[in-house]
Amino acid sequence: MVKVGIVGGTGYTGVELLRLLAQHPQAEVVVITSRSEAGLPVADMYPNLRGHYDGLAFSVPDVKTLGACDVVFFATPHGVAHALAGELLAAGTKVIDLSADFRLQDPVEWAKWYGQPHGAPELLQDAVYGLPEVNREQIRNARLIAVPGCYPTATQLGFLPLLEAGIADNTRLIADCKSGVSGAGRGLNIGSLYSEANESFKAYAVKGHRHLPEITQGLRRAARGDIGLTFVPHLVPMIRGIHSTLYATVTDRSVDLQALFEKRYADEPFVDVMPAGSHPETRSVRGANVCRIAVHRPQDGDLVVVLSVIDNLVKGASGQAVQNMNILFGLDERAGLSHAGMMP
């Protein structure tokens, strides 16, 4: 049984970790921290978890207690893992970070986008980017795993087959992405209030979103060279979900795009390439650790459109974190992640 600690258990990714791990046959949450809620039983904050964590209460983060775990998940704002990850790694504990702290390999670039100096640049050489569909072998031997963001997960999985095959114009990629309001987190945010977000649809951070350098970093690796990406995120009035509509120019019309995508993801348990002509919906992945993809070539032209959908809290965060844990500890990759999407 893998002994699990969670730092930051009061946000959406924290409670989603608890929900998924409650059904995991080979993992047990033994520590969960929150400075503001220390002493409060988990089941009192989250009644949906009654009967699963009745003996577990939030506690103040303590390195000694956390260091006794096999793995610690950080479901925290950026900057928190910088302060604690090094001590936990020194104690022999594996770290899986759901924040952005170790996703970018360049600490200067990280500081530019997150508005503060990187707090642990010496750990970046140990950090493995936790996108299993790309880095599965590195994850197996990792000490520190950086779980990808939600937009980067949906966008990279959609573009990867085209860039790896070298058939797209890498200088003119477009990612038109929509997210539910849970992507903004559980904290008080005027833009996430019901009366602000309901019955409204808007773009934001068009000048530059923090996920842009992460997406670009991953796509450069896939393309083995520079890429040009326009990334525009939008907020839509739903709770969960990411829908990425991706555009790339592929001038070779002889390429069987459906076969290309099916072959690339044939052995991936959590990527579903849908039949030709399909239009994946976010509701089909709600609560599931799945990325559903469809590829189109409208009017048989040069422009290829890829549709990629995920649940931002599952495959875009906590589910992918558990998937990484399973790989890291040699477990069945599907363990605790067999939930089908919730419909309606």
UniProtKB/Swiss-Prot annotation:
<dbReference type="Pfam" id="PF22698">
    <property type="entry name" value="Semialdhyde_dhC_1"/>
</dbReference>
<comment type="pathway">
    <text>Amino-acid biosynthesis; L-arginine biosynthesis; N(2)-acetyl-L-ornithine from L-glutamate: step 3/4.</text>
</comment>
<feature type="active site">
    <location>
        <position position="150"/>
    </location>
</feature>
<dbReference type="Pfam" id="PF01118">
    <property type="entry name" value="Semialdhyde_dh"/>
</dbReference>
<keyword id="KW-0055">Arginine biosynthesis</keyword>
<dbReference type="GO" id="GO:0051287">
    <property type="term" value="F:NAD binding"/>
</dbReference>
<dbReference type="InterPro" id="IPR036291">
    <property type="entry name" value="NAD(P)-bd_dom_sf"/>
</dbReference>
<dbReference type="InterPro" id="IPR050085">
    <property type="entry name" value="NAGSA_dehydrogenase"/>
</dbReference>
<comment type="function">
    <text>Catalyzes the NADPH-dependent reduction of N-acetyl-5-glutamyl phosphate to yield N-acetyl-L-glutamate 5-semialdehyde.</text>
</comment>
<keyword id="KW-0963">Cytoplasm</keyword>
<keyword id="KW-0560">Oxidoreductase</keyword>
<dbReference type="InterPro" id="IPR000706">
    <property type="entry name" value="AGPR_type-1"/>
</dbReference>
<protein>
    <recommendedName>
        <fullName>N-acetyl-gamma-glutamyl-phosphate reductase</fullName>
        <ecNumber>1.2.1.38</ecNumber>
    </recommendedName>
</protein>
<dbReference type="GO" id="GO:0005737">
    <property type="term" value="C:cytoplasm"/>
</dbReference>
<dbReference type="GO" id="GO:0070401">
    <property type="term" value="F:NADP+ binding"/>
</dbReference>
<dbReference type="InterPro" id="IPR000534">
    <property type="entry name" value="Semialdehyde_DH_NAD-bd"/>
</dbReference>
<keyword id="KW-0028">Amino-acid biosynthesis</keyword>
<keyword id="KW-0521">NADP</keyword>
<comment type="similarity">
    <text>Belongs to the NAGSA dehydrogenase family. Type 1 subfamily.</text>
</comment>
<dbReference type="GO" id="GO:0003942">
    <property type="term" value="F:N-acetyl-gamma-glutamyl-phosphate reductase activity"/>
</dbReference>
<dbReference type="GO" id="GO:0006526">
    <property type="term" value="P:L-arginine biosynthetic process"/>
</dbReference>
<dbReference type="InterPro" id="IPR023013">
    <property type="entry name" value="AGPR_AS"/>
</dbReference>
